[in-house]
């Protein structure tokens, strides 16, 4: 029997908590240049390449030193896990405060500062969402782990958490496995893509989809 061809793919999403230091920790650098990342090749959300959660970046003045006279550029990989994205001209934080990017990333590869920075750390903001696929697709199945908080796992007919929710799965208020029934033909998403929102009820989920 020959090999079976299939277009079904899988993506893994695991919710992350807000962090101050997982990208770079408490750095003081003279003049313009690059922040030194905790991993030279770039830092993934949740620290794992397999995690496709997309998150904004926190830039924090960890002490009373003000860094709002400096601008930052953040470069990395976007929510699709492939495309390079960036946000430029971000005004740095005042003393003991945080600024957050509008852009979201699955991996940060470079953070550039325009001038001297003092006691600056960078980390990912909390996130529970990510892009399943950036075009027409079908959800074929999923396997997840629920948390101790009841909630909803939602899938948007879009490439972001906006628009019509086509699939909602309630989750129990207990740590448990989640293996819901999905019809044989799947659930079709025919707009700009399919975007997953784990909410508070899901710790992680693997989504099987047409890609």
Model regions and ranges:
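Surface-exposed, low-hydrophobicity beta-strand/loop segments enriched in small/polar/acidic residues
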Residues: 1-211
């Amino acid at each position: 029997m020959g090999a079976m061809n299939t277009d079904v793919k899988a993506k893994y999403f695991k919710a992350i908590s807000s962090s101050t230091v997982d990208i770079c920790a408490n750095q003081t650098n003279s003049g313009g240049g690059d922040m030194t990342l905790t991993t030279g090749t770039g830092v993934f959300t949740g620290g794992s390449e397999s995690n496709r959660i997309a998150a904004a970046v926190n830039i924090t003045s960890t002490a009373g030193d003000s860094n709002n006279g400096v601008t930052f550029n953040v470069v990395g990989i976007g929510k699709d896990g492939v495309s390079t994205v960036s946000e430029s001209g971000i005004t740095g934080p005042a003393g003991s405060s945080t600024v957050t990017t509008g852009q979201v990333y699955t991996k940060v590869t470079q953070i550039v500062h325009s001038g001297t920075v003092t006691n600056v750390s960078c980390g990912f903001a909390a996130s529970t969402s990510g892009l399943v696929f950036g075009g027409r697709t079908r959800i074929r199945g999923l396997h997840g782990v629920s948390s101790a908080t009841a909630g909803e796992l939602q899938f948007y007919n879009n490439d972001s958490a906006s628009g019509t929710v086509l699939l909602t799965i309630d989750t129990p208020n207990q740590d448990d496995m989640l293996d819901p029934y999905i019809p044989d033909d799947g659930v079709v998403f025919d707009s700009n893509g399919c975007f997953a929102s784990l909410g508070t009820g899901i710790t992680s989920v693997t989504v099987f989809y047409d890609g």
